[in-house]
Regions:
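Accessory interaction regions appended to the cores of large information-processing enzymes
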Residues: 1-188
Length: 188
């Protein structure tokens, strides 16, 4: 597990946390134009962010998987799920979170993906967001940011780049990096 902390923000990344699985009773998804890629491996990660704002501490946990594929399309899916009585689970950072992605936060996750999905810059393959955790102070803005950062982490893992600079940048400055990790592009 990788953890970065400052006074106002914290981030933690781990390979997986099945206790935050989303069963997918509802889901959104689609196909996006993508760049063909030459090589890459399946990458799975879970990211938790904390951000202090005044007396509030906003939290977001998202996780998923990216698998590079052939062609010029990226199939993406966000599983949405909330139990009637979720059991709190220990997050990656201090404190418990409720597994699930309730209404409102689900839109934030999709929003966090849309800019990159619409750019045509993502590599071809399959992307699924299927892990999430929240609490009463979870923020849609932080969930969108967490989703953007998770995409950086998944692509870095799939193509052998470092995800750490993107995470450190967010913790230090509160902003996601503008450029996605470099991926091997297929020659035509």
């Amino acid at each position: 597990m990788f953890v970065v902390r400052t006074f106002g923000r914290s981030a933690a990344v781990d390979d997986d946390r099945r206790e935050f699985s989303l069963l997918g009773k509802r889901q959104v998804g689609g196909l996006a134009l993508a760049r063909p890629v030459a090589t890459g491996i399946r990458s799975r990660a879970v990211l938790e962010l904390h951000q202090n704002h005044g007396s509030a501490r906003f939290r977001a946990l998202v996780g998923g998987e990216f698998a590079p594929g052939e062609g010029d399309r990226l199939a993406w899916r966000v599983r949405l799920w909330e139990t009637a009585r979720p059991t709190p689970q220990q997050g990656l950072l201090r404190g418990a979170l409720l597994p699930g992605l309730p209404e409102g936060l689900d839109h934030a996750v999709a929003t966090g993906l849309h800019a990159d999905l619409n750019s045509g810059a993502l590599p071809a393959g399959r992307l699924v967001i299927d892990r999430a955790g929240y609490d009463q102070e979870s923020s849609p803005v932080l969930f969108a940011t967490a989703t953007e950062l998770l995409l950086h982490i998944l692509l870095a893992g799939a193509f052998g780049s470092l995800a750490e600079p993107a995470i450190r940048s967010w913790v230090a400055h509160g902003r996601s990096p503008l450029a996605l990790p470099r991926v091997g592009v297929e020659a035509y």
